[in-house]
Amino acid sequence: MEDFIRFAISEGFSSYGISSHAPLPFSTAWTMEWDRMDDYLSEFARLKEKYADKIELAIGLEIDYLNEESHPAIPRFQELPLDYRIGSVHMLYSPQGKVVDIDTPADIFRQLIDAHFEGDLDYVVHLYYKNLLRMVELGGFDILGHADKMHYNASCYRPGLLDEPWYDALVRDYFAEIARHGYIVEINTKSYHDLGTFYPNERYFPLLRELGIRVQVNSDAHYPERINNSRAEALATLKKVGFDT
């Protein structure tokens, strides 16, 4: 945690937010365990005091919507003393009830869709946005993380998907619902350098502006040296469509 803060200071940040992946009902390689939560919060408190004269710090969590029992709005997450919460979807249940991680490289995504969903990409895309919409309805978070993260993998699986009318209508309805609830949408720059895409896809930036959705540029960096990656490109793209950055 301290390495991220030091790097943020060296990059000239005036404020910075720390947000680990929140615990899930099962262990993964990339989520925190509940027995580490107190350490996470106390270490942040120590660092906030240590660097108070250099940078404004905030503490949060990125919390998955998994099902009706595990999502950002449940009391266990709401009771935590956090400054902000990010809501996101990384996993889906297959028809057989298996949890499938769909936030993978595109080649692995293809294998998973074929193995667990019989190659039915339309079903997977609809399920993904259904879960996102349910998370929006339940609430309990401030920022919607990588709002259409699946778009890259899905369009690699089936090139041209983003131009299909049903997909465009699905995404537009989704953003309209986000606007109705007043959430901030993260402009996620994590993949821009390597894949040339933001999340959400920049084709929807004008819609976000039209709907009056507030946005926040985030790096989603898992390594300190990447916290400022593609920020300038994201801000320039937002400015082109009328956002005041």
Question: What are these model-derived regions, one by one?
Answer:
Residues S14-S15, S19, D83, D142, ...:
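Short acidic/polar active-site loop segments enriched in Thr and Asp
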Residues A169-R172, I187-V217, N229-A232:
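Extended hydrophobic/aromatic segments used for targeting, binding, or gating
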Residues K130-L133, L138, R203, A236-V241:
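C-terminal functional module detector
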Residues M1-N67, P72, F77-E79, H151-P165, ...:
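An N-terminally biased module of ancient metal coordination in phosphate/nucleic-acid-related enzymes
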